[in-house]
Amino acid sequence: MTVKPLRDVTPKPLEGEERLEQSLRPATFDDYVGQVKIVDNVKVYAAAARQRGESLDHVLLSGPPGLGKTSLAHILARELGVTLHVTSGPALVKKGDLAGLLTALAPRDILFIDEIHRLSPAVEEALYPAMEDYRFDVVLGAGLGAQTMEMKLERFTLVGATTRTGLLASPLRDRFPIQERLEYYGPAELKEIAVRAARKLGLPVDEDGAEELARRARGTPRIAIRLLQRARDFAQVEGDGRLTREVVDRTLRRLEVDARGLDAMDRRILAAVIDTFGGGPVGIDAVAAAVGEESGTLEDVYEPFLVREGYLARTPRGRVALPAAYAHLGRDRSGGKQGSLV
């Protein structure tokens, strides 16, 4: 039987979260916390395009999930005074799906494609002339008698978001003049995000409570807000309605999020690499089978944090547990062979 992990520290949006995220989403560049260099650059690009009355160049936003790529797209549309059209790679199954979106765009509108690395090859190829020449090619008929009809499109901006830049085909990636990678947030930035969100939710919050939540939010705003919601529940039912350090600590212990921000699935991954595979190296598919999760989910959701925090290493031969993983789980490294990093 597959045991599903607790999902409170999963950086991907859960069902029903979109509405809350929209209510807490920053409305302007000045409201956006963190990613200072990226925001400063994009602010200049947007202002220049607006002054010239042109569409903004196509933008590719990459980085781990939950860091604010969608929020940046919304802010761009608002700053440019245009409409944002939102879709995702998996939703664009055939060329007709893309055609319907492109032909509905007004001049300078933004088309936001989340998970753009998951576009089908046919849709991706149809996107090339749309991005370069603002046209969409429609094939009429089949075989030798087939003809291509060009549909002219309004000049628009494509904003693509991806967590897996390496899965993007080079011809697609190279068609984005503006490419920015979002990085994990520091504790001070996450604290500010938590305090702002608590204020919007009408939740009194202590400084040390916000600091503790930020410290254990895996560098990800979406996780910080999710944990804030759960802490609000505990503060309301088992406390005096105020978010204190004690309330946050009690909440996260109940959610099995430890002092370093690792959850039950993180610990299962590390335990599998150490106990089942002798510390590695071991392939991602083997680890996924051992913990009962899809390998893509491990690569997108869990591994980036474990690698960044020094618990796990990705090597040409597979995943290897690092000394911090042994120490965190209380394992003796002499109990099994330690894999080579080369």
UniProtKB/Swiss-Prot annotation:
Major subcellular site: cytoplasm
Residues annotated as binding ATP: 24-25, 66, 69-71, 132-134, 175, 185, 222
UniProt function note: The RuvA-RuvB-RuvC complex processes Holliday junction (HJ) DNA during genetic recombination and DNA repair, while the RuvA-RuvB complex plays an important role in the rescue of blocked DNA replication forks via replication fork reversal (RFR). RuvA specifically binds to HJ cruciform DNA, conferring on it an open structure. The RuvB hexamer acts as an ATP-dependent pump, pulling dsDNA into and through the RuvAB complex. RuvB forms 2 homohexamers on either side of HJ DNA bound by 1 or 2 RuvA tetramers; 4 subunits per hexamer contact DNA at a time.
Subcellular location: Cytoplasm
Positions bound to Mg(2+): 70
PANTHER family from the UniProt entry: HOLLIDAY JUNCTION BRANCH MIGRATION COMPLEX SUBUNIT RUVB, PTHR42848
Keywords from the named record: ATP-binding, Cytoplasm, DNA damage, DNA recombination, DNA repair, DNA-binding, Hydrolase, Nucleotide-binding
Region (Large ATPase domain (RuvB-L)): 1-185
Protein's recorded name: Holliday junction branch migration complex subunit RuvB
UniProt cross-references to HAMAP family, sorted A to Z: DNA_HJ_migration_RuvB
Gene3D superfamilies found in the cross-reference section: 1.10.8.60, P-loop containing nucleotide triphosphate hydrolases, Winged helix-like DNA-binding domain superfamily/Winged helix DNA-binding domain
Pfam families: AAA_lid_4 (PF17864), RuvB_C (PF05491), RuvB_N (PF05496)
Residues annotated as binding DNA: 314, 319
Quaternary structure and partners: Homohexamer. Forms an RuvA(8)-RuvB(12)-Holliday junction (HJ) complex. HJ DNA is sandwiched between 2 RuvA tetramers; dsDNA enters through RuvA and exits via RuvB. An RuvB hexamer assembles on each DNA strand where it exits the tetramer. Each RuvB hexamer is contacted by two RuvA subunits (via domain III) on 2 adjacent RuvB subunits; this complex drives branch migration. In the full resolvosome a probable DNA-RuvA(4)-RuvB(12)-RuvC(2) complex forms which resolves the HJ.
EC number assigned by the record: 3.6.4.-
Region annotation (Small ATPAse domain (RuvB-S)) ranges: 186-256
Keyword DNA repair (UniProt): yes
Top class in the EC scheme: hydrolase
Catalysis: reaction(s): ATP + H2O = ADP + phosphate + H(+)
